[in-house]
């Protein structure tokens, strides 16, 4: 049992091969105006719009989580604190009796907060692709500007960086309200 839980959680944090896909045509173009879930430390985490930053939202289930680092590492290196990077885990398939174990494993494996969606309602509302990393670029209003799913590769990371750059440049061009 411990081995199964360890394997489940190990795959929640770490690259599998699949070509990234662009956003399907029937997916929403706006994120919910507010998402509030608890993280692995049982602290409430809130993502609400309008906000102040460009947000990179990663969404994954057990298998898709293996692909997250391939996206987040180069984006964090390039953009640093200029973007808000948030993680959302689909843990809706975890049986209720194992939730505490999963939460504790998450605590040991991830030092940054990851929103845990036990019901699956939030990930469903965001129309994520199961078994793949899902990466969404959201502007300060919560509009989904770019959506990619699958494993990162140099071209897909470059495309995502270009989308983020466009948002940051457009935001810098607009005069701030005084």
List PLM regions with ranges.
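Bacterial N-terminal signal peptides
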Residues: 5-15
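N-proximal helix/coil linker or "cap" segments that precede and/or mark the start of modular domains
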Residues: 14-33
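A short beta-strand-turn-helix
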Residues: 35-54
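Structural microenvironment flanking redox-active thiols in thiol-disulfide oxidoreductases
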Residues: 53-56, 63-107
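Short, internal strand/loop/helix patches
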Residues: 84-88, 102-132
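Thiol-/selenol-based redox modules, centered on thioredoxin-like
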Residues: 131-178
